[in-house]
Curated annotation (Swiss-Prot):
It catalyses: Release of signal peptides from bacterial membrane prolipoproteins. Hydrolyzes -Xaa-Yaa-Zaa-|-(S,diacylglyceryl)Cys-, in which Xaa is hydrophobic (preferably Leu), and Yaa (Ala or Ser) and Zaa (Gly or Ala) have small, neutral side chains. This is Lipoprotein signal peptidase. Its main location: membrane. It comes from the Bacteria. It is a multi-pass membrane protein. Keywords: Aspartyl protease, Cell inner membrane, Cell membrane, Hydrolase, Membrane, Protease, Transmembrane, Transmembrane helix. Pfam families: Peptidase_A8. This protein specifically catalyzes the removal of signal peptides from prolipoproteins.
Length: 164
């Protein structure tokens, strides 16, 4: 399998996993009516509608703001796809594919629902307080894994020979 094909497979896999998990939680498990569900002492399934970007930054309920965020995301996906098509290493193309698949998954949510569906909440009770991370989804996991793959690939690559 060529590196580009590996990246495309990663993008499609990330997109399918993300959308399947969200559709199942929303329409089969019906998390909207059930409310938060404790899965383990440190992990809950919750429903959070994120109208902003990462970590809830730039929250917007206006159609103009949502359109701007979608346009920025579409532009980023196009640039990432060009980078992926030109990439020479399998790890980089897989990383870029994961980022693209995650970005498209979240963009589908924003287009379909007006917000991104987040549902994973990790928390740790410590010294009488509960510390928690932001609520996220599988698209976010794919994006982070893709960035880690790109960073790892950049450290693995052998430096080009210096010109004489």
């Amino acid at each position: 399998m060529t590196p580009l094909r590996s990246g495309i497979v990663a993008a499609v896999a990330a997109l399918i996993a993300d959308q399947a998990s969200k559709l199942w939680l929303l329409f089969v498990f019906d998390i909207g009516h059930r409310g938060a569900v404790r899965v383990t002492p440190f992990f809950d399934l919750v429903l959070a509608w994120n109208t902003g970007i990462s970590y809830g930054w730039f929250q917007t309920d206006s159609p103009v703001g949502a359109t701007i965020l979608l346009a920025i995301k579409a532009g980023a996906v196009v640039l990432l796809a060009i980078w992926m098509a030109r990439s020479q290493t399998r790890l980089a193309t897989i990383g870029l594919g994961l980022i693209i698949g995650g970005a498209i998954g979240n963009a589908i949510d924003r287009f379909a629902y007006g917000a991104v569906v987040d549902f994973v909440l990790f928390h740790v009770p410590l010294a009488g307080k509960t510390y928690s991370w932001y609520v996220f989804n599988l698209a976010d996991v794919a994006i982070v894994a893709g960035v880690i793959a790109l960073l790892y690939d950049s450290f693995l690559r052998t430096p080009a020979a210096k010109a004489p």
